Design a protein with these regions (language model features):
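Amphipathic, small/basic residue-rich leader segments at the start of a protein or domain
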Residues: 1-84, 95, 101-105, 109-112, ...
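A conserved active-site cap/scaffold subdomain adjacent to cofactor or substrate pockets
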Residues: 235-237, 241-258
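A short, Trp-centered hydrophobic/proline-enriched beta-strand micro-motif
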Residues: 113-121
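A structural signal for short hydrophobic beta-strand segments in well-ordered beta-sheet cores
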Residues: 135-138
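Conserved small/polar residues in nucleotide/adenosyl-binding loops
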Residues: 259-265
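Long, acidic (Asp/Glu-rich), low-complexity accessory segments flanking structured domains
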Residues: 212-229, 234
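A short core secondary-structure module
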Residues: 147-193
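Flexible, small-/acidic-enriched active-site or ligand-binding loops
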Residues: 186-213
Length: 269
């Protein structure tokens, strides 16, 4: 019991010390993205993640100390809303399945909202049956060539990166022939078509892939592991969306609307 309490005390003190440094940094910048970058570098983005990946390698319960302190200081935490598909769903999935290089490359600009993320699951002909998807990725030696279509892609027109599930092996049971990729949404052959709502807004999109080349280092997880990665992302989605619910009648914008209202300019408040 004493040992456990000591560990708790040490972890709490570590977070509070880091928070003091972060709050002090606030007086040095009016750029909220720079502030979020400092938060990441101090390990206060996700305290449970490894050091160097926005975390401190400690129990996630200590993240509450960070959240409460930033709220107390009146500092915006809306990056978690503006880039909810990245921070809420992409980050934990990349931590679980990504390579060290992927973790190093993607997480920091994701947290600062310099790079917005989307996910691409649904297809016009597959309905709710994810395993029946038909978007194909064919090995051409040093990468994969992707052809197909996705639909209902939230924030696809704003995203720099997308999480894409494809079929890489048509000759095995459908759940086993899937592979996940991290795709650059600015790649040649990627076409994003906004789906206009009656309000005139376009939160959702169709995304077309025509001979899109994706390097092999952009595979997330292992070849053929796409079904497992998909289930992880969907689990993370429930947690992320549930944690950002707005009270009905509050007048506060939801996660997607907030992104439209604030990007590309977000101010420190």
């Amino acid at each position: 019991m004493v040992k456990t309490e000591t560990k708790h005390s040490d972890a709490e003190q570590l977070v509070r010390t880091k928070l003091d440094e972060l709050i002090e940094f606030r007086s040095q910048t009016d750029d909220i993205k720079e502030f979020w970058g400092k938060q990441f570098d101090l390990g206060l983005a996700w305290v449970q993640y490894p050091e160097g990946a926005g975390g401190l390698g400690i129990n996630p319960k200590y993240q509450l100390l960070v959240t409460e302190k930033l709220r107390e200081e009146g500092i915006s935490q809306q990056n978690r809303v503006a880039n909810i598909l990245g921070i809420g769903m992409g980050a934990p999935t990349i931590i679980e399945y990504g390579t060290p290089e992927q973790i190093s490359k993607y997480l920091r600009p994701m947290f600062t909202t310099d790079e917005i993320w989307c996910q691409m699951f649904s297809e016009p002909g597959s309905g709710s049956d994810l395993a029946s998807l038909s978007t194909k990725a064919v090995d051409d030696g040093d990468g994969y060539i992707v052809n197909g279509q996705k639909v209902w892609t939230t924030l696809g027109h704003l995203a720099k990166w997308g999480l894409l599930v494809t079929r890489t092996d048509p000759d095995v049971p459908k759940h086993r022939g899937l592979t996940f990729f991290i795709v650059d949404m600015e790649s040649d052959g990627v076409e994003v078509r906004p789906l206009r709502q009656i309000t005139g807004e376009a939160e959702f999109n169709e995304v077309y892939f025509t001979d899109v080349k994706i390097p092999k280092e952009n595979i997330l997880g292992s070849l053929g592991e796409g079904w497992r990665v998909s289930l992880t992302i969907l689990m993370n989605e429930r947690v992320a969306i549930g944690g950002n619910v707005r009270e009905r009648g509050s007048g506060a914008p939801g996660p997607v609307s907030y992104t439209h209202l604030t990007l590309p300019t977000i101010l420190l408040v």
